[in-house]
Amino acid sequence: MSTATSKFLSYVLRHAPESIGLVLDSQGWADVADLLAKANASGTPLDEAGLRAVVAESDKKRFTLSEDGRRIRAAQGHSVKVDLGQPPVEPPPQLFHGTATRFLEPILREGLRPGERQQVHLSADRTTALAVGQRHGKPVVLIVDAGQMFADGCRFYLADNGVWLTDAVPFSYLTVSADSSAENDR
């Protein structure tokens, strides 16, 4: 898999389809043939085999192909407005969010907000959250009381790639994990 191709697809399908003249539908889908043509016209060589390889080999399953293989979209992480069409689902009692310790103070004061994305991303396990936090510096894992949030009327969605999504997490539902190491996974 080409990392450059994966980054290009993430940029175009999550954040800037207009950068190559691509149009996403309301659920974030793009026509594969149109994507390939516009990628090549913009100077990014891409064929169908290469595209399918990136989709198949992405360890984080960032992209989803439609059942007929004619459309593609990012599984989650959009900054452009899309409705992934996922129904709200009941989450597990706890979810996890990984971040860097330097971001901890404002998070504990204001809660988790989506920032430039449409929704907050949460993990079902501590190990994944820890890996996410390590990308940004010294990691810390936050435990989200998802069960109580759900009971209080907050909605959760499960993306195609297993990432949990919600609009925001108020600080009152957050606890700092006493041990942010992977071996304490729940």
Curated annotation (Swiss-Prot):
One Pfam family linked to the record: PTS_2-RNA
HAMAP family in alphabetical order: KptA (MF_00299)
Entry keyword annotation includes Transmembrane helix: no
UniProt name for this protein: Probable RNA 2'-phosphotransferase
GO molecular function ontology, one term from the record: tRNA 2'-phosphotransferase activity
Keywords from the UniProt entry: NAD, Transferase
UniProt-listed NCBIfam families: PRK00819.1-4
Enzyme class name: transferase
Enzyme nomenclature, EC number: 2.7.1.-
UniProt similarity note: Belongs to the KptA/TPT1 family.
PANTHER family reported in the protein's UniProt record: PUTATIVE PHOSPHOTRANSFERASE, TRNA 2'-PHOSPHOTRANSFERASE 1
Biological role stated in the UniProt entry: Removes the 2'-phosphate from RNA via an intermediate in which the phosphate is ADP-ribosylated by NAD followed by a presumed transesterification to release the RNA and generate ADP-ribose 1''-2''-cyclic phosphate (APPR>P). May function as an ADP-ribosylase.
UniProt-listed GO biological process terms: tRNA splicing, via endonucleolytic cleavage and ligation
GTP-binding is among the record's keywords: no
